[in-house]
Amino acid sequence: MAQDEKDIVGSIEFLEVVGLEGSTYKLKGPNGEEVKLNQSEINDEDELQIGEEYSFFVYPNRSGALFATQNMPDITTNKYDFVKVLKTDRDGAHVDVGLPREVLIPWEDLPKVKDVWPVQGDELFVTLRIDRDNNMFARLATETIVEQMYTPVFDDEKQNQVIEARPYRLLRIGSFLLSKYGYKIFVHETERKEEPRLGENVSVRIIGHNEKGELNGSFLPLAHERLDDDGQHIFDLLVEYDGELPFSDKSSPEAIKEIFNMSKGSFKRAIGHLYKNKIITIESGKIALTQKGWGRIEK
């Protein structure tokens, strides 16, 4: 492939319409490149005119032949955005960038630990890249790129707010997140129980910011909302039994011991803490998870 031809791939270009064969237009690039256009990829109701130039996005098909579309993708070789993961396999993550074909993020660019690979529905912050053989891939944004693009926050406006964001970089020391509003958030390893997936939609509580306007966050609940061992055990059993158990502070010590393996006093203290923090309700001789309680499962 000639260098000039490579320069138009993955970008938006003005191409001249030089012919029509069946349902396929023939286009010519600025340096004489031959590009094809299927009629289904025209967004103008009027037919294209032979000899006229129009704006198109140029991309290679799986065989490397150049095609064009007027349906502009979410990303280009000069533009980054979040794109949805369609599937993952041994080759890497296949993503939807708004083109007639899916695009691959090679496995070499994903985390070494497959447990934190993205799954279908996750979204990754990427750009397009074209290799020497005219193959098109998606590339994860680097820390340098995010540093140039994030929206800084220099006050305490976001303090204790819960923000939805997605991890774009995962390290042993912590998780680096980016929100759809451009906030850059770092969650130290001590502020998480487990590492999120790359691209997973997570809720993070803001606990501070630094001099560069980067936010610090936590996946852990506030200290007064954290559960002790007994509270966590009751919570886990509630989740296991679809959020409801026929027990209350009126239940017998024997029944409590049999199911929860704790004394009645410990049980009453634990459900009292859960109730105070609106994690459960206690009524009609039973305990049940609240909406807030169900929400803790994601944490």
UniProtKB/Swiss-Prot annotation:
Signal peptide: none
InterPro entries, per database record: CvfB_fam, CvfB_S1_2nd, CvfB_S1_3rd, CvfB_S1_st, CvfB_WH, NA-bd_OB-fold, WH-like_DNA-bd_sf
Family: Belongs to the CvfB family.
Name the UniProt record assigns to this protein: Conserved virulence factor B
UniProt organism field: Staphylococcus saprophyticus subsp. saprophyticus (strain ATCC 15305 / DSM 20229 / NCIMB 8711 / NCTC 7292 / S-41)
Taxon lineage: Bacteria, Bacillati, Bacillota, Bacilli, Bacillales
